[in-house]
C-alpha cells in the first residue's frame, strides 16, 4: 500500500484535504472527528499528529461533485445541516468531520433497516442526529429539527426538488445553502437526464432558490448531477 508523502488543506474547498501518496496518486480526505474509527472501510492516514479519512469519490456524491469542480464547498465548522436520505452515513460521516463537535446534522432516513446501520455510526459521532422519517412529510419531524444553515439531499423520489423545497420552507435559514444530488433515473426513466435536471432546477427557482452551480457526477455516478443553490426566504 502506497505511503503518504504529504497531506495539505484543499486550496478551494473548506474542511477538505489533499492526500499525496508515494505512487503519485492523490486522494481527497477529511480530518477524522473520531480517530481510529472507520465508517465504510475507508483508508485512514496519519500526518502531523492528526488522522484523516480518505473520501471515496465512488461512494459519496459530494466527493464526486468536489472532484468534478463544484463552485464551492459551503459547509463550515459549527453549521447545522438537514440531511435528507442519509442512508448508512457514508457522506454524512465526512460532513460530520467538517462541521465538527459544535455542528449538528439532522439525518432523515425512511428505511428502518438502513437506519439501524446508520444509528451505529451516530452512536460514535455525536453530531449526527438520526430521524426515522419520510422526507416528503417534513411536518412530522418539525419538532426534531432546528433552523439549519444548509440542506444536503440525496433522495430517490420522483419529485426531488419539490420535496427539498418543502423542507426548506420549514427549516432552511435565509440565504441558506442546498446541495441536491439529482438522480435522473429515479425521477423518470423515459426522459433524458438533461431534461430531468432542467425540470428540477426550474422547480427550485420557482420555490425561491438561486442556482449557483450544477455539476455532473460522471464517471463516479451515472445520470446524476449535484445542484448547489442558495435559498431566499419569502
Curated annotation (Swiss-Prot):
SS bond partners: none
PROSITE patterns (UniProt xref): FIBRILLARIN
Entry keyword Methyltransferase: yes
Entry keyword Metal-binding: no
Residues the record lists as binding S-adenosyl-L-methionine: 90-91, 109-110, 134-135, 154-157
A Pfam family of this chain: Fibrillarin
Gene3D superfamilies documented for this protein: Phosphorylase Kinase, domain 1 (3.30.200.20), Vaccinia Virus protein VP39 (3.40.50.150)
Entry EC no(s): 2.1.1.-
MF (Gene Ontology): histone H2AQ104 methyltransferase activity; RNA binding; rRNA methyltransferase activity
Keywords: Methyltransferase, RNA-binding, rRNA processing, Transferase, tRNA processing
GO biological process: box C/D sno(s)RNA 3'-end processing; tRNA processing
InterPro entries linked: Fibrillarin (IPR000692), Fibrillarin_CS (IPR020813), SAM-dependent_MTases_sf (IPR029063)
Protein's job: Involved in pre-rRNA and tRNA processing. Utilizes the methyl donor S-adenosyl-L-methionine to catalyze the site-specific 2'-hydroxyl methylation of ribose moieties in rRNA and tRNA. Site specificity is provided by a guide RNA that base pairs with the substrate. Methylation occurs at a characteristic distance from the sequence involved in base pairing with the guide RNA.
Subunit structure comment from the entry: Interacts with nop5. Component of box C/D small ribonucleoprotein (sRNP) particles that contain rpl7ae, FlpA and nop5, plus a guide RNA.
PANTHER family, sorted: FIBRILLARIN (PTHR10335:SF17), RRNA 2-O-METHYLTRANSFERASE FIBRILLARIN (PTHR10335)
Family classification: Belongs to the methyltransferase superfamily. Fibrillarin family.
Protein name per Swiss-Prot or TrEMBL: Fibrillarin-like rRNA/tRNA 2'-O-methyltransferase
Organism of provenance: Staphylothermus marinus (strain ATCC 43588 / DSM 3639 / JCM 9404 / F1)
Encoding gene, per UniProt annotation: flpA
Amino acid at each position: 500500500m502506497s505511503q503518504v508523502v504529504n497531506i495539505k488543506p484543499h486550496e478551494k474547498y473548506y474542511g477538505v484535504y489533499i492526500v499525496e501518496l508515494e505512487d503519485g496518486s492523490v486522494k481527497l480526505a477529511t480530518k477524522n472527528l473520531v480517530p481510529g474509527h472507520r465508517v465504510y472501510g475507508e483508508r485512514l492516514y496519519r500526518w502531523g499528529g492528526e488522522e484523516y479519512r480518505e473520501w471515496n469519490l465512488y461512494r459519496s456524491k459530494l466527493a464526486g461533485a468536489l472532484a468534478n469542480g463544484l463552485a464551492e464547498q459551503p459547509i463550515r465548522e459549527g453549521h447545522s445541516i438537514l440531511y435528507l436520505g442519509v442512508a448508512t452515513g457514508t457522506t454524512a460521516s465526512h460532513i460530520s468531520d467538517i462541521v465538527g463537535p459544535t455542528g449538528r446534522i439532522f439525518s432523515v432516513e425512511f428505511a428502518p433497516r438502513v437506519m439501524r446501520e446508520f444509528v451505529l455510526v451516530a452512536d460514535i459521532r455525536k453530531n449526527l442526529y438520526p430521524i426515522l422519517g419520510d422526507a416528503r412529510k417534513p411536518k412530522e419531524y418539525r419538532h426534531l429539527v432546528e433552523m439549519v444553515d444548509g440542506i444536503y439531499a440525496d433522495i430517490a423520489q420522483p419529485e426531488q426538488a419539490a420535496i427539498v423545497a418543502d423542507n426548506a420552507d420549514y427549516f432552511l435559514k435565509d440565504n441558506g445553502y442546498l446541495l441536491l444530488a439529482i438522480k435522473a433515473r429515479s425521477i423518470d426513466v423515459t426522459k433524458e437526464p438533461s431534461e430531468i435536471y432542467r425540470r428540477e432546477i426550474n422547480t427550485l427557482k420557482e420555490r425561491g432558490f438561486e442556482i449557483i452551480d450544477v455539476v455532473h457526477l460522471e464517471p463516479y455516478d451515472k445520470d446524476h448531477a449535484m445542484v448547489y443553490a442558495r435559498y431566499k426566504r419569502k
